[in-house]
Amino acid sequence: DPPYNTGNKDFVYNDSYVDSEDSYRHSKWLSFMEKRLKIAKTLLSDKGVIFISIDDNEQANLKLLCDEVFGADNFRNTLYVRRRTKTLNLQFAENGLNSLNVGAEYILVYARNGYLFKEMRVKKKDLPSKGSWNVFWSNADRPTMRYELLGFTPQTGQWRWAKDLADEAVENYRDYLYNHAELSLEEYWEQTGRSKKFIRRIPNGFGKNGGVQYWVGPSDTFLRTSNWTDIEVSQIHKDFELPFNNPKNVELIKEILQAPFYKTSFILDFFAGSGTTLHATMQL
């Protein structure tokens, strides 16, 4: 969580605060960051990862710098995190605005080499009542996964599951149609332990997938993407008796700390600030 270079004297270069009047403030900030990022790279393990929080002031410059330091191939994601928006002064809004209110900040994610995310799931606000049918064909290219299924064999791409699992899913759906059609597929899935898989083929299906579909049951979670706008980036400083204007949200840091696929990690916070990283670590 480095200084954002907002022009409000938020970082020191050569023993002097840098403000918005300094015509070299962007280059000074980049020099300030480059030294620290190079040290960070030497400390990262082969499976290490670095998360860097930033806003619009330097996001574009920081991305280029990180591509240079860590290698563009080691860029993983830009995470988008919700920012508390300020109330607009309606007196000025009525005359037109130079720009829209800023509603998000960014977290750049770079790996050393072999970093892996685990599957991260987020609770949905409302549980869907229906499952959905999805295309069973994938554009990956493993010839061993191109087998005959329901009278169709893909010529390119592949099926999503191994043949034995797919054949079982076909039989599951046939059993449902012939013996349990008085139930909805969702009800049947619930009654059988929410574990059965189903595959069908749409009549006269054509195209790369031949109309073959697999069923995904209702879920109270969804797979997390790079859109983290369900989490606010900062906590209101008045919530804490701390001399910091924008302490990071503990829940955000906890989510970051739980992102790695690996069970054990060493955690380093270069700009400890209000101690949120330690706080989050102790809560895990």
What is the meaning of each model-derived region?
Residues 2, 265-284:
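A phosphate-binding catalytic loop at a beta-strand-loop-alpha-helix junction
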Residues 2-266:
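Class I S-adenosyl-L-methionine
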